[in-house]
Amino acid sequence: FTDFKAVGHSNGGLVLTGLLESGFLEKKKLTVSKLVIIGSPYQFNQEMYDDFQTWKHRLGKEVEVLNFVGSFAGKSDGIVPLSSAQAAQSIFEKQAYTEVNLKGRKAHHSALPTNPDLVKQLSLFLNL
């Protein structure tokens, strides 16, 4: 295979973003066509966030990004502040980017991957 779709929850979204910006995939002639990030804390560490901003020009314009953020406890999913999860938008500003804000009890950080609304939208986005 030369093309794949990727899903990352929490720090997994950060790892995938770092991978996409690293240049490694291009060297291996691999592309990511769709990226799903779920409750990822992009502003967890300022140095890391600054690095994402520095290297975002390496992100392929062909990747479509779907970002799920949770509002469980007001301005967070109980773990990740809403503003930190939404900071992905400034990193993926040249990509097709969609953000979905999930609310309520099933929008808690650890419950996000099994949230029925998320699973349905993720399945449609990935053509599963």
What are these regions (language model features)?
Residues 1-79:
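Serine-dependent carboxylesterase/thioesterase catalytic core
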Residues 58-128:
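C-terminal catalytic-base region of ester-bond hydrolases, centering on the histidine
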